[in-house]
Amino acid sequence: MIGRITGTLIEKSPPVVCVDVNGVGYEIDVPMSTLYALPETGARVTLFTHLVVREDAQLLYGFGSSAERSTFRELIKVTGIGARTALAVLSGLSVAELSQAITLQETGRLTRVPGIGKKTAERLLLEMRGKLGADIGATPHAAGGHQSDILNALLALGYSDKESQAALKKLPEGVDVSEGIRLALKALVR
């Protein structure tokens, strides 16, 4: 397996880049977040890679960090998520944002990614729960461990993900679930 490539970036044509390594040009599919972070053509780059060998093709996927590659590998294990969809997820959400969405069970955030419908988002949340290390970036803002319960209650009441998140940010430190819901509803009514 090819785990990492270092060479000269010779071409960028989204979502593919071409990296020259000692005279051999490797075409590598990358998420848009990685593509935007790459330097101009002619510069030296290092990409962490994942090789997929199929009957009709050998495909190389590249990432700016090993954490991003690990997340990609976890995503493609989810039923209904292929490599293209996993790239779309990583193009739309950083690893920290994805981890937070999984921890807080935010289907709304995932369904904004092209190719992810409600059922796929729910399956992804179910199958990925607890698989992204220490759930990077998912530390609850104000409501301690009750934040996801409060968020789910607000979403069940018909409030959007954006409205619910804004209300959660206004909650005081360490509030319990029932008090948190009451305060969040009060903030949303204003």
Swiss-Prot record:
Homotetramer. Forms an RuvA(8)-RuvB(12)-Holliday junction (HJ) complex. HJ DNA is sandwiched between 2 RuvA tetramers; dsDNA enters through RuvA and exits via RuvB. An RuvB hexamer assembles on each DNA strand where it exits the tetramer. Each RuvB hexamer is contacted by two RuvA subunits (via domain III) on 2 adjacent RuvB subunits; this complex drives branch migration. In the full resolvosome a probable DNA-RuvA(4)-RuvB(12)-RuvC(2) complex forms which resolves the HJ. Residues 142-190 are annotated as: Domain III. Belongs to the RuvA family. Its main location: cytoplasm. The RuvA-RuvB-RuvC complex processes Holliday junction (HJ) DNA during genetic recombination and DNA repair, while the RuvA-RuvB complex plays an important role in the rescue of blocked DNA replication forks via replication fork reversal (RFR). RuvA specifically binds to HJ cruciform DNA, conferring on it an open structure. The RuvB hexamer acts as an ATP-dependent pump, pulling dsDNA into and through the RuvAB complex. HJ branch migration allows RuvC to scan DNA until it finds its consensus sequence, where it cleaves and resolves the cruciform DNA. Has three domains with a flexible linker between the domains II and III and assumes an 'L' shape. Domain III is highly mobile and contacts RuvB. One of its GO terms (cellular component) is Holliday junction helicase complex. The gene is ruvA. This is Holliday junction branch migration complex subunit RuvA. Residues 1-64 are annotated as: Domain I.
